[in-house]
C-alpha cells in the first residue's frame, strides 16, 4: 500500500474543469491529486514563417510554473532572462505529442498555441499538461468546426500521458506523486493515443537498472492508466469529437 493509500495500479483522483479561463478558445484546469495545471488553447490565423504558403497549420506549446507551485519558491524564468533546459524540453514534448494526433493540413494555415501553467506541483506536471492540453485543443478545434472556419475536425485520435515508476519497496507504480518520483529507482513518462499507439516514451534508471520484464510491466501499467484517462476525456468532451467515438 502506498503512503497515500492507493494501490500500485491506481491513478490519483483526476478532474477536468472545462472553460476555466474565459478568453481562450479552449481552457481546462486539470487536477491530478495535488498537481494542478491550467491548459489554454489559443487560435491564431497565421503560421510560422517556415510554413507560410504550404497550406498546413501548426501546434506549439509553452510551459511554466508559478513560483510557489512547489514547496520552495522558485524564481520566475522571466526574471532570469532565459528559459531553462527542463522547460524547453517539456514545451517541445507537449507540442510534439499534440501534433501526432492532428492532421495539420486539415487545420489550414493557422496556429494553435498551447499554454500550460502549473499552479500546484506534486509530480507528473508534464504528463498532466499533455492530458489537459489535448482537451483544451479539442475544445478550440470544436469551436472552429462549429463556426464553419474549418469543415471537419483535424483531430485523428485521443491523447493522454502518465508517469510510471519502479520502487525498491513497492514495486511497479502508476501515476507517481513527487515523493514517489523522488524515491523511484526507475521512472518513465508514457504518451499514448486512444487507439493504443505510443507517441513517446521517456525512461530513466536513477542509479539503478531495469530488465525487459520490468519495462513490459511498466508499459502495461501505463497503458491501463492512459485508457482510464482517455475514457474520462471522452466523458467530458461529449459531442466535441463525435467522429472519434
Curated annotation (Swiss-Prot):
Q: Which reaction does it catalyse?
A: tRNA(n+1) + phosphate = tRNA(n) + a ribonucleoside 5'-diphosphate
Q: Which gene encodes it?
A: rph
Task: Report the top EC class in one word.
Answer: transferase
Extract the InterPro entries matched here: ExoRNase_PH_dom1, ExoRNase_PH_dom2, ExoRNase_PH_dom2_sf, PNPase/RNase_PH_dom_sf, Ribosomal_Su5_D2-typ_SF, RNase_PH, RNase_PH_bac-type, RNase_PH_CS
Please name the HAMAP family in this protein's record.
RNase_PH
One Pfam family linked to the record = RNase_PH_C
Q: Which organism is it from?
A: Bacillus velezensis (strain DSM 23117 / BGSC 10A6 / LMG 26770 / FZB42)
The free-text function statement in the UniProt record for this protein reads: Phosphorolytic 3'-5' exoribonuclease that plays an important role in tRNA 3'-end maturation. Removes nucleotide residues following the 3'-CCA terminus of tRNAs; can also add nucleotides to the ends of RNA molecules by using nucleoside diphosphates as substrates, but this may not be physiologically important. Probably plays a role in initiation of 16S rRNA degradation (leading to ribosome degradation) during starvation.
Which protein is depicted? Ribonuclease PH
State the family it belongs to: Belongs to the RNase PH family.
Q: Which residues bind phosphate?
A: 86, 124-126
